[in-house]
Amino acid sequence: ILSNGTPALLYELVNSNNLNNIFDDIFSVEEVSIFKPNSKVYDMPIKKYNIQNDNVAFLSANTWDVSGGGNYGYYSIWVNRNKSIFDNLDYKPHTEIENLSELISLIWSAHLASFKNV
């Protein structure tokens, strides 16, 4: 999780929804004292895990959030639950899904595609 929310709020949400074993980490903007879409926010997981930004999938239901992650170089996924039109921004997401269950097939497809490149 990478959020503008406070650590206390984020941990409470994760714990109260029994998602403790789902997420490896929770990153809050409080760690860098600045809000998204500042690049320092998106740098946090990159630095911690020593990975390239194009190896990260970033998903959100908020268009500005998807744009920020995508502009940083993350693979952006817009969760469009309401079949809305993407805001008039200078960025369009890589992929659009209607619900989180679609994420499973998206990840599986990417996993299978990675074998084709070996």
Label each residue range with its predicted role.
Residues 2-7, 11-118:
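Asp-based, Mg2+/Mn2+-dependent phosphohydrolase catalytic module
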